[in-house]
Amino acid sequence: FIAYVGIFLEKNSTTKQSLIDLENIPFVTVAHITTGKFNIFCKVRARDTKHAKDIIFMIDDIQGVLRTETMISLEESINDKKRLMHRIFNEL
């Protein structure tokens, strides 16, 4: 399944290294630097809830991470990549 993890950092200056460390976790598939509540917002793919917990603990272990907040995706309702690809192929 898919989960989204908002990451709170101790300091903004740790953002670059935190992203490097996130890149070393293969189950983190997307990461964004964001404004607002979180410093970094990422997408995680997990096999099950235990696997998701393990991934979240890996993220929590990154130096500079203060805490995380996780949201589990119940359903993908809109996927612009899929719509865009269908449109491109239909125009060919």
What are these regions (language model features)?
Residues 1-92:
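A compositional/biophysical signature of low hydrophobicity enriched in polar/charged and small residues
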